[in-house]
């Protein structure tokens, strides 16, 4: 989970929607939110070590995790990770990977995708198109 968060924050931490998603639930008055936004952003950077080397390493670990999910699904028939029923394994894996594909109706569905830089949009599209991304989206659409 830490690698998903580190890699993802490495891509999006400077976008205003991220801080809005973190701070808006607290309904801070405008001036207070202005003060807390940079403090929160810097705290997240430190907490998750959002630095190029660590983000790159986390990207590799995320890739390994996605490949493992895809291999597991291929061996088991493709719908669920363990057997032919929705289990805690599916809940855990789908919820940990959901931030990567931003399923509709989740807190991760926070961006107006047209406003994303082309490179980030391509990463999101690539993640959604691969089997693990399709699986996460299906679990959120069908089993939630």
Predicted features by range, described:
Residues 1-144:
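C-terminal alpha-helical interaction module
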């Amino acid at each position: 989970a830490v690698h998903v968060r580190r890699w993802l924050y490495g891509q999006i931490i400077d976008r205003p929607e991220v801080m809005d998603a973190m701070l808006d639930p607290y309904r801070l008055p405008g001036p207070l939110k202005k003060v807390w936004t940079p403090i929160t952003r810097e705290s997240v950077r430190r907490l998750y070590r959002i630095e190029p080397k660590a983000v790159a390493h986390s990207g590799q670990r995320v890739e390994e995790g996605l490949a493992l999910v895809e291999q597991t699904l291929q061996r088991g028939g493709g719908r669920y990770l363990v057997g032919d029923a929705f289990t805690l394994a599916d809940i855990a894996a789908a919820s940990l990977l959901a931030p990567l594909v931003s399923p509709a109706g989740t807190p991760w569905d926070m961006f107006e995708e047209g406003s994303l830089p082309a490179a980030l949009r391509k990463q999101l599209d690539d993640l959604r198109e691969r089997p693990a991304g399709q699986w996460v989206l299906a679990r959120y659409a069908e089993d939630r």
